[in-house]
Amino acid sequence: MFPHEEKLIRERLGREPNEVEKAMLEVMWSEHASYKSSRPFLKLLPTENEHVVLGPGEDAGIVKFDDETWIAVGIESHNHPSAVEPYGGAATGVGGIVRDILCMGARPIALLDPIRFGPLEKERNRYLLQGVVKGIADYGNRIGVPTVGGETEFDESLDNYTLVNVACVGIMRPEHFVHSYVEEAGLKLVLVGNRTGRDGIHGVTFASEELSENAEEEDRSAVQIPDPFTEKLLIEATLEAVYTGKVRALKDLGGGGLTCASSEMAGKKGFGAVIYADRVPLREPNMTPTEVMISESQERMLFAVREEDVEEIGKIFEKYGLEWTVVGEIIKEPRYIVYWKGEKVADLPIDLLTEVPTIEWETRPYSLERDVETPKISFSDAFELVWSSPNVLNKRWVWEQYDHEVQGRTVVKPGRDAAVLKINERYGLAFVADGNPNHSHLNPYHGAMGAVAEVVRNLVSVGAEPLALVDNLNFASPERPEVYWSFAETVRGLADAARAFGLAYVSGNVSFYNEVVDRPIKPTPVVAGLGKVELEKIPGFGLEEGLLIGVVGSTKRELGGSELYVRLGLKGGIAPRVNLEEEKANAEGILEAIRRGLLKAVHDVSKGGIAVALAEMAVLGNTGFTADLSKVPAETSNPLEVAFSESHGRYIVVFPEERLEELKALFRHFAVIGRAGGSGAVFLWNGDELLRKPITKLREVHESFPKLLGEEE
């Protein structure tokens, strides 16, 4: 809390807050809980369209899938905790987002995990990766929720640090929807789940400041302890309770613990709450009321129910072996009062906890873009560099640790443009997350637009009509003027791109103060998207013998932030621009081509450019190709720029020759560049050979990720 905020609180109360009140206020006024630095900009984001049932403001967003099915979706970061204790930090990140979905009345059905680390040459970064992946895998597998996709990327700005973002979707019937706030006084507050301990105390305040060099020792107690077995019981018990129709409001205890859950539940519609902190079941002896109120012990939920329904709901919890207690009630008066063994230990106006004033920091624009001459290296050397990049390698090592098939809904599995989950006999839900900090670092506005465009392309590539978005904004300290400016520009880019596609953000997360000892991370907006797809229309992904290969979209000289430049250590360049008109037209064209059954396979072009997209399709289809890159619709005649530019709006399509004329009619920029077949990848330029590689060699490199961790495949 800043000195001017402490002064404001003293003036409002007319006195000094006592120890319990001060601890609760510190938690609720933290950046992590209050969004005080980000709220002024977040209101720019579009939050409504015909698919949105519930936009931002509760624990998760809700999207209409059809008349009988709604989808709850949310995204969270657990960056600081995972950097300090990677296993526990990542595991509790999964637990938290699953409970966010659960408390809307939805059954969690899938997770995505966009995760980022420093260079793998360093042992500490390998330790963080292995711990985070094991934490996500163990927790997700044990609660029976599949992890179906995500990103695993590496960047020098994350040395000794990690970004762990987790998105979750759940499925629900409209009649089971429960709000996270109350609409009447007199309700009893029932706490259920794990006992409360000292873990996670000041978790939100720790997440609202940069990490020190000794964070691993100093901040370990701020990381919560995961217990997936209790979470599994909590999922089933919560849904059974919700299905009775007698749960009036429901929140999980995440950041800020009991203070945050109960004050937000009561305060949203102007009610108050009385909490009897000494009734909370404790895991450790001699805990103080302060510790009880701000503990972030995991696997706990807070239910608001009418007095006459308490016993019925309680019996459900007992059936699952879960401990439950009435810890308070909702009152008419808008105050937040805490008792401890009969003594009043806190008494605050509830809006002092829930309505935190915003802060607008100084902004300072910067520009890192500058024209850079394309390097004069051979095509073969450039391809080897990019194809062997840790960001391009197949992450099978990661996703094979996750049970991605539990619940039996996963139709399109990890490793494709987007995962697809079966919702009913005819339709599936496509789910994907994307971000490109290298583009955002060069130009935060266009980097953010690009993240939205890539999500749309990934959804469209599996035949899905995009429905809605969620965003996770990972930034360094907002107190740095350049960082705050890049945040504002990012939100502007996210808003403009979503509006152009007619999409809305239904939930999101902001994580500031991602820096270690004065070293800020790059701006890293991560966007996750949902789409609806007809299951029998999903195209393939790999090449097939004898089929034509086409490129949709125009390639520009846009190598700034590209994988090629990163591998060569080149700074600057121009970040790719999104031509919204072309991006939309191409997405609509691809969807129409899929609807008509014109395409056998589709892959969007993104990281690594056309060269990488083609090689990935060859490896997946176990089929070679011959492709003349001089035929690609492009504004440059440099083979390296055509092959490795990361221009937006582009797709590789694979189709039988008889469909060519129909496809040509759908796109402004379209060309056949070659044919699939044989056992090698052959790149040409004006008929001359640039590179020839056997598929076996391509696969050997592509599957070599475990070697970077010192493991054999």
From Swiss-Prot:
Its main location: cytoplasm. GO terms for biological process: 'de novo' IMP biosynthetic process; purine nucleotide biosynthetic process. GO terms for cellular component: cytoplasm. One of its GO terms (molecular function) is magnesium ion binding. Keywords: ATP-binding, Cytoplasm, Ligase, Magnesium, Metal-binding, Nucleotide-binding, Purine biosynthesis. Mg(2+) 2 binds at D100, D252. Mg(2+) 1 binds at E76, N509. It is found in: Cytoplasm. ATP binds at Y35, D471, G508. Substrate binds at S77, H78, N79, H80, R99, Q224, E296, S297, Q298, S511. It is an enzyme of class 6 (ligase). Pathway: Purine metabolism; IMP biosynthesis via de novo pathway; 5-amino-1-(5-phospho-D-ribosyl)imidazole from N(2)-formyl-N(1)-(5-phospho-D-ribosyl)glycinamide: step 1/2. Its EC number is 6.3.5.3. The active site is at H32, H78 (proton acceptor). It catalyses: N(2)-formyl-N(1)-(5-phospho-beta-D-ribosyl)glycinamide + L-glutamine + ATP + H2O = 2-formamido-N(1)-(5-O-phospho-beta-D-ribosyl)acetamidine + L-glutamate + ADP + phosphate + H(+). InterPro entries: PRibForGlyAmidine_synth_PurL (IPR010074), PurL_linker (IPR041609), PurM-like_C_dom (IPR010918), PurM-like_C_sf (IPR036676), PurM-like_N (IPR016188), PurM-like_N_sf (IPR036921). Part of the phosphoribosylformylglycinamidine synthase complex involved in the purines biosynthetic pathway. Catalyzes the ATP-dependent conversion of formylglycinamide ribonucleotide (FGAR) and glutamine to yield formylglycinamidine ribonucleotide (FGAM) and glutamate. The FGAM synthase complex is composed of three subunits. PurQ produces an ammonia molecule by converting glutamine to glutamate. PurL transfers the ammonia molecule to FGAR to form FGAM in an ATP-dependent manner. Belongs to the FGAMS family. Monomer. Part of the FGAM synthase complex composed of 1 PurL, 1 PurQ and 2 PurS subunits. This is Phosphoribosylformylglycinamidine synthase subunit PurL.
